[in-house]
């Protein structure tokens, strides 16, 4: 939606903001980058109770607007995370020079600021209509156990647009196969525009081939693809086994969109009926996926309940071309990554999983004798963390950014990302 800033109001606000921030007024917001690195697209999230400590009580129908010292309003997203009809957090994106400090004014308003907002993050999921068009974007959906994968030899269109939920930002994109495969795939993007409402709606335009916006750049097969999930367990016969979150035993799956653009998008996938093996109760898994503008990753927060006591949560990176798995331990993060000619466009693609170093037990190549998951480098989390795990999955395609054209460029990028992950923007 395009709106115009009211110039006179902005000029008046600019004068007030300058004096307020100079005097340390409670209405001021200070953001500081304490690193010597540039930071692009930093997500700033301010909870409502934190804002009320500064501004006083904020009634349900009111908003908080954010303006810089020139009176220019920031694009702010108001997210109702608990679905009670009132926003709980505001989210905005800011970029910083090395060691830069920024000052803003916070104000309670009757409505959001009237500005031109560029959408930098989006999630969508829609079902196919009888006429082979696709319906509206769904806030909630579910599939039964044993939802089959699409057989494109028998039907031109899948039951869901691009076979399931997709999430993107202005740099990259991802999707989930909403069926028994339950795999995660990568959209390589060459445009900042949101494209995934259009991709896949016309079968004459093959998204496996390079287009002006990009393409599907990953072959997943029976691997863990781009950060799919599995559980390492000891089976009833005492053998260690890796059981993917997929197949008939995955049970019913629930999809919910939590929030959507212009700043960030969050979706939640629930798997409450996963029969990991015979003789135990169903395991309950929730995968909450976030993406925001300016980044080459999605972030996954996984919670697991009722898992066997000795089990370990596992995620992974597809390994179809036998590129080496590289490991870096830096700035409190463990990084597992591959790089090389492994995109479906036959050019360079870097993929990485980044998580807290203290959370990871092993990074390894999956043995070839494993049958339920194949061609995968695995990241196994410590057993003590099976109730909640956080990780980021990165996709660095050379057509998205020249930094990813070389192995050293991708490595340097990941090392810097670990520093930025550790050294948060100071908010006060």
Please report, for each region that a protein language model flagged, where it lies by residue.
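Bacterial Sec-dependent N-terminal signal peptides
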Residues: 1-30
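Solvent-exposed beta-strand/loop surfaces of large extracellular or lumenal domains
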Residues: 60-88, 277-280, 321-337, 358-369
């Amino acid at each position: 939606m395009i709106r115009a800033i009211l110039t006179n109001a902005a000029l008046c606000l600019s004068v007030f903001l300058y004096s307020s921030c100079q005097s340390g007024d409670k209405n001021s917001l200070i953001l500081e980058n304490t690193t010597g690195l540039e930071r692009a697209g930093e997500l700033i999230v301010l909870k409502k109770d934190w804002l009320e400590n500064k501004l006083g009580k904020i009634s349900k129908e009111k908003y908080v607007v954010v303006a810089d010292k020139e009176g220019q309003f920031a694009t702010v997203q108001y997210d109702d995370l608990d679905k009670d009809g009132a926003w709980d957090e505001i989210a905005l994106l800011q970029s910083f020079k090395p060691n830069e400090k920024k000052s803003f004014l916070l104000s309670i308003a009757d409505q959001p600021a009237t500005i031109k907002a560029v959408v930098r993050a989006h999630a969508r999921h829609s079902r196919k209509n009888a006429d082979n068009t696709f319906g509206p974007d769904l806030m909630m959906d579910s599939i039964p156990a044993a939802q089959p994968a699409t057989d494109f030899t028998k039907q031109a269109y899948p039951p869901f647009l691009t076979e399931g939920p997709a999430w993107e930002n202005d740099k990259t994109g991802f999707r989930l196969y909403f069926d028994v495969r339950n795999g995660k795939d990568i959209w390589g993007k060459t445009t900042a525009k949101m494209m995934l409402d259009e991709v896949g709606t016309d079968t004459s335009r093959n998204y496996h081939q390079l287009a002006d916006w990009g393409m599907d750049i990953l072959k997943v097969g029976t691997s863990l693809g781009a950060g799919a999930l599995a559980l390492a367990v000891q089976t009833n016969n005492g053998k260690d086994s890796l059981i993917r979150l997929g197949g008939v035993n995955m049970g019913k799956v629930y999809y919910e969109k939590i929030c959507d653009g212009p700043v960030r998008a969050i979706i939640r996938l629930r798997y409450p009926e996963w029969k990991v093996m015979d003789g135990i109760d169903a395991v309950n898994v929730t995968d909450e996926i976030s993406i925001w503008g300016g980044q080459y990753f999605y972030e996954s927060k996984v919670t697991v309940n009722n898992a066997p006591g000795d089990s370990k949560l596992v995620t992974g990176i597809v390994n179809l071309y036998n590129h080496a798995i590289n490991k870096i331990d830096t700035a409190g993060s463990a990084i597992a990554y591959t790089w090389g000619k492994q995109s479906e466009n036959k050019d360079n693609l870097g993929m990485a999983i980044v998580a807290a170093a203290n959370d990871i037990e092993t990074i390894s190549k999956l043995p070839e004798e494993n049958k339920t998951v194949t061609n995968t480098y695995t990241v196994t989390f410590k057993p003590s963390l099976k109730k909640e795990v956080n990780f980021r999955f990165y996709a660095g395609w050379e057509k998205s950014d020249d930094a990813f054209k070389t192995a050293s460029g991708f490595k340097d990028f990941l090392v810097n990302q670990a520093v930025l992950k550790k050294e948060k923007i100071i908010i006060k």
